[in-house]
Amino acid sequence: MQTLDRPTFEALSVNFGHWKKTGDLIDQCIDLMLNLRQSDHPGGSRSKVPFLVSTTLGAMRWDVRRPELPFADRFVLVAGHCCPVVYAMLAVYNEALRLRHEQTGDPRYLVPGGEQRQLVWQDLLWLRHNG
């Protein structure tokens, strides 16, 4: 959801428990995808989880459904070894949207062009899969 007003600590703090659980889910996805491939260590990605959760769920003007919006904030991670955290975050957020749409039928939980644009948890099985 786009953040329209400047976020305040008081407004954001009511969600901190949800953010912690979201971070735990992202951490688990990172561990699973890297362990499946016996690839690298998760330290770089896992250290970025709290930052990404807090910025993308409240501090930034960013919408996972429409990241191309003209006034949306952008985030950039320079280190390539941090790619797993972005993949895991997108998988968790998109699964949450899918579940909410399934529960409510509300079209606002759909991602436009979802099949082509959404990274889903099944995609994590192919991280660093060469052949």
Predicted segments — roles?
Residues F16-I30, H41:
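Conserved N-terminal diphosphate/IPP-binding helix and adjacent helical/loop segment
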Residues M1-K20:
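Non-catalytic, mobile gating and regulatory segments of ester bond hydrolases
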